[in-house]
Amino acid sequence: MSKQLIYSGKAKDIYTTEDENLIISTYKDQATAFNGVKKEQIAGKGVLNNQISSFIFEKLNAAGVATHFVEKLSDTEQLNKKVKIIPLEVVLRNYTAGSFSKRFGVDEGIALETPIVEFYYKNDDLDDPFINDEHVKFLQIADDQQIAYLKEEARRINELLKVWFAEIGLKLIDFKLEFGFDKDGKIILADEFSPDNCRLWDADGNHMDKDVFRRGLGELTDVYEIVWEKLQELK
């Protein structure tokens, strides 16, 4: 399968394929935090992220969620549907943590009565600012119907993920999703789902996600390996 690099990101390289509607995503060993300010090469990270994300996306596909995932090609590669990415990070929070706790001056780990969905404008130059529905419409990123769909789909995905992670003894604190338009103009889930873009805590409150790297709490791949081993316990 011939391929040509079309995009190089912080965590993945994206390549063309012989099919104009398909791409290959290659996961890197690079870890970044604070929008790339903190950066490090960590051997084995790409393999673990690809394993975890492929596993989660397969389960989401089976549960009826429309995603870009087609198949896992190798240890670090997966085949995806090509999408036009919507420049929004869709963040869903089940508990207070991270920037939410800083913004509102509250402790981390407080359960939210209703999960909160937030939007962040994907723009590195602006440091991905927190925006609301009206900003999304002003920037012509999405209309009312599309905004409602993104929120509804994030909540639906959350209900699935919460159950799966609870089954393996992990609490899903929050996560970031990205969506895009497929060749037919349908909004589908894209990017990845791994400890890079979610927060997971174990029963003792230990971080099982990229906060280990952000906050210097230990070896990132050790934690990701534990998450991967636990996920394989799911039926």
UniProtKB/Swiss-Prot annotation:
EC number per UniProt: 6.3.2.6
The GO molecular function terms of this record are: ATP binding; phosphoribosylaminoimidazolesuccinocarboxamide synthase activity
Q: In which pathway does it act?
A: Purine metabolism; IMP biosynthesis via de novo pathway; 5-amino-1-(5-phospho-D-ribosyl)imidazole-4-carboxamide from 5-amino-1-(5-phospho-D-ribosyl)imidazole-4-carboxylate: step 1/2
Give the EC class as a word.
Answer: ligase
Q: Name one GO biological process term.
A: cobalamin biosynthetic process
| Xref: PROSITE patterns | SAICAR_SYNTHETASE_1, SAICAR_SYNTHETASE_2
User: Which SUPFAM superfamilies does the UniProt entry name for this protein?
Assistant: SAICAR synthase-like
Q: Which UniProt keywords apply?
A: ATP-binding, Ligase, Nucleotide-binding, Purine biosynthesis
Please give the catalytic activity noted in the UniProt record.
5-amino-1-(5-phospho-D-ribosyl)imidazole-4-carboxylate + L-aspartate + ATP = (2S)-2-[5-amino-1-(5-phospho-beta-D-ribosyl)imidazole-4-carboxamido]succinate + ADP + phosphate + 2 H(+)
Q: Which InterPro entries match?
A: SAICAR_synt/ADE2_N, SAICAR_synt_PurC, SAICAR_synth, SAICAR_synthetase, SAICAR_synthetase_CS
Question: Which HAMAP family does its entry note?
Answer: SAICAR_synth
Say which family it is in. Belongs to the SAICAR synthetase family.
In its UniProt entry, what is this protein called? Phosphoribosylaminoimidazole-succinocarboxamide synthase
Native organism is: Streptococcus pneumoniae serotype 2 (strain D39 / NCTC 7466)
